[in-house]
Amino acid sequence: MASILELRSRIKSVNSTKKITKAQELIATSRITKAQSRVAAAKPYAEEITKVLSELASASASLDHPLLNERTDPKRAAVLVVTSDRGMCGGYNSNVLKEAEELFQLLRSEGKDPVIYVLGSKGLGYYTFRDRDLGGAWTGFSQDPGYSDAAKASRHLVDLFMAGSGSEVPAPNGEGTIEGVDELHIVYTRFVSMLTQSPEVRRMAPLEVMVSEEHVELGEDMLSNGHGSSNSEPVAGYNFEPEPDKLLGALLPKYISTRIYSSLLDAAASESAARRTAMKAATDNANELVNTLSRQANQARQAQITQEISEIVGGANALASSAGSD
């Protein structure tokens, strides 16, 4: 058994660590509420731009836009992987990176070359350590993303997609050029609840379009949790100026930015929830470890006292025996 001094030193060390994990837990808890509020605040805009684009697509003379049309022979697919800038969030990053690897395998099996783009320092470090080629990376805002952060990534990715494979566009860092792509995908973590966060894969371009007899809708819409726009409500009539085709071309890139921004907000809430869960588990484990070490220290102290008493009694008996023999 370890000595009492060693056990007390370990108890002190664990208590110091527990203070850190408890503080991180409280900070993450406060950030979850803010992140959820931002998700809720962004939802009305996301829903309205989806409705307007659906109306534009319905009023358009044709749906002949690169962001809506499937490429005949897609060769390259850009994948935007959303990770965190900081650690101590349990399996948050490993889960989304695992989901991304599965997507890469699927794309390769379809004959497409995946081009990796990363949001977050953890993802950047993961791929850099493994010597994986990256098309670009954006870091420093995973916990508090702004629309401008999403727009920076969106501008480059839309340019990349509009160029298509075989054409070159400037690299996001301004150094050299990079070949265009035929598909855009995003891998992020969707916030379900405080205890559940689900890694998700979504294709951003070309957008899926569902055409009915009277209406056109954008399919697989993640801006309204996958439910799309509701047909149960009366639809207002629109008079578009300029022509619907021109408006559609102007709004579709903004729609891609909105999808990325919505994913970043979801990921920020998921990151805080995962960090809170991980830090709470660490704090609980620290409490259990302190209790165990305290019990061992008490047992060691009790054994030491018992040994000291035994030595005193033994010495007294020896003295008594020596005095009796004299």
Curated annotation (Swiss-Prot):
Q: How does the UniProt record describe the way this protein sits in the membrane?
A: Peripheral membrane protein
Tell me the organism's taxonomic lineage: Bacteria, Bacillati, Actinomycetota, Actinomycetes, Mycobacteriales
Instruction: Tell where it localizes.
Output: Cell membrane
- What Pfam families does this protein's entry cite? ATP-synt (PF00231)
Query: Which GO molecular function terms does the record list?
Result: ATP binding; proton-transporting ATP synthase activity, rotational mechanism
What NCBIfam families does the annotation carry? Answer: ATPsyn_F1gamma, PRK05621.1-2
Assembly behavior: F-type ATPases have 2 components, CF(1) - the catalytic core - and CF(0) - the membrane proton channel. CF(1) has five subunits: alpha(3), beta(3), gamma(1), delta(1), epsilon(1). CF(0) has three main subunits: a, b and c.
List GO terms (cellular component aspect). Answer: plasma membrane; proton-transporting ATP synthase complex
- In Swiss-Prot or TrEMBL terms, this protein is called ATP synthase gamma chain
Tell me the Gene Ontology biological-process terms attached to this UniProt entry: proton motive force-driven plasma membrane ATP synthesis
Quote the function comment for this protein.
Produces ATP from ADP in the presence of a proton gradient across the membrane. The gamma chain is believed to be important in regulating ATPase activity and the flow of protons through the CF(0) complex.
Q: Which gene produces this protein?
A: atpG
Q: Which family does it belong to?
A: Belongs to the ATPase gamma chain family.
Q: Which InterPro entries match?
A: ATP_synth_F1_ATPase_gsu (IPR035968), ATP_synth_F1_gsu (IPR000131), ATP_synth_F1_gsu_CS (IPR023632)
What HAMAP family does this protein's entry cite? ATP_synth_gamma_bact (MF_00815)
Which keywords has UniProt assigned to this entry?
A: ATP synthesis, Cell membrane, CF(1), Hydrogen ion transport, Ion transport, Membrane, Transport
